[in-house]
Amino acid sequence: MYCRLLLKLILRDKAVWICTLVLAAAFFVPIAFNSPIYGPFFMKQGMQGFVDAFNTRAPQASGTDLSPEQQDDAELARYANAALAAQTDAAFLDSAESYYALMDEGFQSGSIVGDRETNDAELAYCRALSSSGITDIPASANDLPFLSFLPYAIAAAPSFLPFIPFLLSSILLLGATRPATLAAKAPAPKFRRLIQIVFSIIVAGTAMLLAGLAPGSIYALALNGFGQIGYPIAFFHNGALTTTTAGNVFTTILLALLAGGTLISVCSVVLSTATRRVFAGPLASALLVAAPAFPLLSDSALGHNAALELLPLAVFSPIEATGYVGCFPTEFIGSGSGGASMLAVALVYVAVLFAVGAVVTRSPKQAGPAKKHHGLELLDASVGYGSTTILSIGSLFLSPGTAAGLVAPNGSGKTTLLEALSGQFPTRIRSGSLAADGISQRQSAEFAELVYLSSSGGADLYPTLSALEHLAFVREAWKSAADIDSLCSSLGISPYLDKPTRKLSTGMKQQVKLAMAIATDCPYLILDEPLNGLDPGKRKTSCDAMRSEVARGRSVLISSHLLDDLADLTNSFYFIEAGTLVEKIKSSSQTLKQEYLDTYEGGE
């Protein structure tokens, strides 16, 4: 249910679709421009360069007049010319293998100096192809089968690109679950909620990435087939020649992308939860993803810095630990990690971060049994935000079946007090205690089942979801038995239940939020400016609905500047005077408006 809501939010966000289109375009670039496969391209380029150099310096003498070195050069030139003139891949492969084998002899004897590692990788590639009986060598991106397209597309794109979907999903879903949002108010253990958010980010990020890869993958599959699992790949890794297959690389790359996405998701959610800063986690994850591109973290730096080797950087540039078809790299960022160790390091970090998440979301145990009396009670408290304390409260008690009003000018701290009472903002209460029916607000999941705050802003509503979807989520999350149809009919919101809330007027949104509060079945409702933006008829409808809930035994605390309506609804009031909360009982000799004017000397 919770994950379903988050995935709906992702699916309906335009940024997600834009990101997917950008990914699809970026991964399709090699095919669109028919980029050469650098292995065969550089093999032929190297051979052609050798032939040109040989022809320039070749002596006119022949046969026995040539020195052994000149004879070797002539033999190399013959193999190179044969490879360059080959009409089939099999003929090219046969001549190329002989060319690189002779080059290898020259390296061993010392008669040839240069890039031996690349020559060794090219020779291993040719021999592996010959021994496997595979003679098809892709020359350009349009020749790649499905199995080879994924690694090549990942290699051709910037290393951070495949992980953008996970970063974007993290930002969107952490924003959708920040304090005061509907998802944040849902009663659930904090660690379970953390896991659900992480899972939703992984699912959304993976779906975006696969959708971005789909056009190129489908094109490669349709044009060149699935490919051969045993197609050889050769490259130097950590100073040693490594040979593997296209099937192994494909699997490792997929696992690395998933491991990297999981690491981003967990890091983003845990750090944002621990710091209570929505963007702290995604920012840290973005730095990790971008790190392989930093000069400081180059292969030479990693080779001399044990601390940097402990970072899970290789998983964010997996192609450099796996190689890919036709490419013979000899240097790597994170060269100390092979495919298996790269994945292992990433998963260790995931496990550690989950452990940190379990610690930071742990709720303290209730100190002794819950008190037997009923009511919402804030005692001996100071309330504030940031580094500022704005209210001192001796006692605020809301007993079952009562309605109380909160009255004060703008800027006095009404919203801060209501947020403190909701339990959703634990840092709002600097000292003192808050409990509902004896359940401390520190027991966040149990407390959320009892107390619901309907905020004055738009945080309660998601613009892309309909009113009905909000109400359905509320009913399921709070395990409510509320009759949604009857509730909507009584408030007059049935005609626009299927509209996205961004298309509703301010008054309509107010009524939807009131319906959501009622639908929770929470015994204590805290309503911040629930009557703002309503015409007289709708105000009466909303007041009747609140009065009906009080008659059913629910308690309501209402903040409003509409004093006449507030006076009709409530039988006690709380005023904020000079930073202190003062309770005043309803008087028959003085109206609430007169009381307000006397208290604030002409203030609102």
Show where each model-derived region lies.
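Secretory targeting signals
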Residues: 31-39, 135-171, 198-269, 273
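Terminal transmembrane helical anchor/hairpin motif
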Residues: 36-49, 135-144, 225-248, 282, ...
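The feature captures the beta-strand-to-loop junction immediately N-terminal to the Walker
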Residues: 407-409
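Helix-to-loop junction immediately C-terminal to a conserved catalytic motif
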Residues: 422
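Conserved ABC transporter NBD signature motif
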Residues: 430-447, 583
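Q-loop/switch helix immediately C-terminal to the Walker
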Residues: 453, 463-477
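Conserved ABC ATPase "signature" region
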Residues: 472, 481-497
